[in-house]
């Protein structure tokens, strides 16, 4: 959510460049912190699953969601450290990771398949699609800032980062496509 402040600040020319740099540092720090706990939670969840069901990883939709969160954060941090993305790119990808997290935490529960199919909350799908629409609008605003800026969104071509992001979305859509809802 901190990335939203950066994107709106950049889009509407609010705040100074130093303010936006501090926001980007916060996004970086929160992502590092979140990645640490996502990795620990994913590994400990796998250990617990192995003790409970006799398997570490079964490609359950919830497990895939945990993997997508970790991969998304790793991609963003590596792209930033490698110089592939600048401040705007990092914040736009942070919003994309938020969408992945919403999908992984709430949308996957509605698939009615796998070990984690327990969240059949009525009316939640409408709210999920509203969140997706809002976040797509924020990403679009961020990308429009790229088009209007002279410095640009990406420092150098980031084919590797885009490949890995495409992999995350492939895992997400394959998870949805190969799970049946009755």
Regions found by a protein language model. Give the residues of each.
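Hydrophobic cores of alpha-helical transmembrane segments in multi-pass integral membrane proteins
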Residues: 1-13, 22-52, 61-115, 125-182
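Conserved non-cysteine loop/helix-boundary elements of the Radical SAM core domain that shape
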Residues: 19
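Catalytic nucleotidyl-transfer cores of nucleotide-processing enzymes
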Residues: 120
């Amino acid at each position: 959510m901190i990335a939203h402040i950066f994107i709106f600040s950049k889009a509407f020319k609010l705040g100074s460049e130093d303010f936006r740099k501090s926001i980007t540092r916060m996004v970086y720090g929160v992502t590092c912190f979140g990645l640490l706990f996502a990795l620990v939670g994913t590994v400990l969840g796998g250990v617990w699953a192995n003790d409970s069901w006799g398997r570490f990883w079964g490609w359950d939709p919830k497990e895939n969601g945990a993997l997508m969160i970790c991969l998304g954060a790793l991609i963003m941090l590596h792209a930033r450290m490698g110089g592939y993305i600048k401040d705007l790119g990092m914040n736009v990808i942070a919003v994309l990771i938020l969408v992945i997290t919403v999908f992984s935490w709430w949308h996957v529960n509605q698939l009615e398949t796998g070990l984690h199919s327990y969240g059949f909350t009525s009316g939640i799908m409408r709210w999920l699609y509203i969140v997706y629409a809002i976040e797509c609008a924020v990403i679009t605003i961020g990308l429009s800032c790229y088009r209007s800026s002279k410095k640009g969104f990406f420092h150098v071509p980031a084919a590797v980062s885009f490949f890995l992001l495409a992999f995350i979305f492939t895992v997400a859509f394959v998870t949805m496509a190969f799970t049946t809802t009755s």
